[in-house]
Design a protein with these regions (language model features):
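Short, high-confidence coil segments that cap the C-terminus of an alpha-helix
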Residues: 73, 120-124, 186
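A short acidic (Asp/Glu
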Residues: 16-19, 42-44, 87-90, 136-142, ...
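Conserved catalytic core of nucleotide-sugar-dependent glycosyltransferases
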Residues: 86-175
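Short, well-formed alpha-helical segments that are part of the catalytic scaffolds
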Residues: 4-26, 38-45
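Conserved glycosyltransferase catalytic-site signature
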Residues: 60-65, 171-178
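Active-site-proximal specificity loops/subdomain of glycosyltransferases
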Residues: 33-79, 84-100
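Short beta->alpha connector loops
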Residues: 10-14, 58, 157
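Catalytic donor-sugar/metal-binding loop of nucleotide-sugar-dependent glycosyltransferases
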Residues: 180-187
C-alpha cells in the first residue's frame, strides 16, 4: 500500500493546488517539503505534515533526492504542487477526440490500487503521462515505456541507494533517474 504522498512546494503556501484536489483519505498521507523560509507559515497551516528542507537545498533535483532518501524505506509517491487529476477516455464515434473529466474519489482508489498491484508485481517506479499528450486508443488506459512527465511513485525498499540525482545539465533529473534505474535492470 502507498504509505506516503510527498509534495515538494515553493511559493504556494496559501494555494496548495494538488492537496486541494486530493480526497480526504489521501490528504492524511501527505507531507509537504518546504524551504526553510516558508516553513513557519506552512507549519501554521498544515502542522506536522510539513518537513523543512536543509538550508543548502535550493533546487528541485536535490529536493527530490532528499525526499527519496527520507522515504526510501516506504512505498511513496511524489506529486508536484500544482496538479489537477484528469481522466481522458475515448469518445466513441468521434475519431481522435477524447472526453476529459476530473478524478472522482473512486478514480483515486483505482489509481492507487493499480500502482500497488504494479509494485506487488515487481515494478519499482513509474510516472504519469502529461494530460496534454493525446492518448493512443490502442494502448488506453495504460501506456508502457512512454514519456513520463515526472517520477510519480517509488517502491523505496526495492530500489538502489546509489542513484545520482543531479549528474547531468542541472535539469531533467527525473528522466536521468529513470534511465539509471532502467539501465540497472529495474522496472
Amino acid at each position: 500500500m502507498i504509505q506516503h504522498i510527498v509534495i515538494p512546494t515553493l511559493g504556494r503556501t496559501h494555494n496548495q493546488i494538488t492537496y486541494k484536489n486530493l480526497p480526504d483519505n489521501l490528504k492524511e498521507k501527505v507531507y509537504f517539503t518546504v524551504q526553510p523560509h516558508e516553513y513557519d507559515e506552512m507549519n501554521d497551516i498544515y502542522g506536522d505534515k510539513v518537513l523543512k528542507l536543509p538550508e543548502e537545498i535550493k533546487r528541485i533535483a536535490p529536493t527530490r533526492e532528499w525526499i527519496f532518501n527520507k522515504f526510501n524505506d516506504t512505498r511513496h509517491m511524489v506529486f508536484d504542487d500544482d496538479l489537477e487529476f484528469v481522466v481522458k477516455e475515448p469518445n466513441p464515434g468521434e475519431g481522435t477526440k477524447w472526453l476529459s473529466r476530473r478524478f472522482t474519489d473512486q478514480d483515486f482508489v483505482d489509481a492507487l490500487d493499480l500502482v500497488d498491484g504494479w509494485m506487488d508485481e515487481g515494478i519499482c517506479f513509474g510516472g504519469l503521462l502529461p494530460a496534454w499528450v493525446i492518448p493512443d486508443v490502442k494502448q488506453w488506459p495504460v501506456r508502457e515505456n512512454q514519456r513520463m512527465m515526472t517520477n510519480w511513485f517509488f517502491n523505496g525498499p526495492e530500489l538502489p541507494r546509489d542513484i545520482q540525482w543531479n549528474r547531468v545539465m542541472g535539469g531533467a533529473e527525473d528522466f536521468d533517474v529513470n534511465l539509471q534505474l532502467l539501465s540497472s535492470g529495474f522496472k
